[in-house]
């Protein structure tokens, strides 16, 4: 038996392309318009893209289509923005799709968007989790890009069966599922903070330190769903959201006492609750 990355998630599917894979600005933009109006949708996975370059916000808008661009921007500007995940493309190029490149020129979009390249574990690329031969690289959107498994992923088909598929279109939903898990684990995070946590905790060592290829590195959900950096307690009457709030670092503090005092302290603290925060205030 198999299950997805975020198997408790509710899925909404939108048909924006024909059976041959053809789409238009009207169909993709129209889908984004529908998604914008559905409050229950938190993350939008896009396993599609435009094989073209753009070097400004206005040029990107022209390349990907004004309706698609405007509705994507609108989704990113909602009071609770929707996170957009885009496949980087499968053309073995040094730059990703135009949709990914758009993230470099629109701060509202880039705050809640992720571009995804694919790593490989088969003959389609170098074994050992390196960038798949078919995958585009992060290029100029390295700041908004991450790598995830996308080679020979066992998944369902539209015919109701299961098969192996490869491509950044398989890597993107891995990241969408990862973002859903972070949202589930840390429900108080904003969408932008969820994206930041995913990118910050990626494995960026050794091979994955090549930002032009891998952006922030290889997605690491174990790190993303556990404490980041220091564990701290908030001091006395401070407010969590106050920029002047002070904390006590738990790692750098210790407490030694006699057995009698220790027992008394344990009894006094029984049933009490202590809040502990990591470096993301979570």
Identify the function of each model-found stretch.
Residues 41-46, 112-115, 184-281:
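C-terminal subdomain of the subtilisin-like protease fold in secreted/lumenal serine endopeptidases
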Residues 1-27, 39, 55, 79, ...:
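Subtilisin-like serine protease catalytic core
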Residues 7, 36, 49, 76-80, ...:
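Sec-exported extracytoplasmic/periplasmic mature domains
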Residues 29-32, 69-73, 113, 131, ...:
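Extracytoplasmic/secreted envelope proteins and their assembly/folding machinery
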Residues 20-22, 123-126, 205-208:
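A short beta-to-alpha transition loop/helix N-cap that caps and shapes the active-site region
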Residues 4, 10-15, 42-48, 83-87, ...:
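Structural recognition of the beta-strand scaffold that forms the well-ordered cores
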Residues 102-184, 188:
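Extracellular S/T/G-rich loop segment that most often corresponds to the catalytic His/Ser-adjacent loop
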Residues 14-110, 158-166, 170-172:
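Substrate-binding/access-modulating region of protease and related hydrolase catalytic domains
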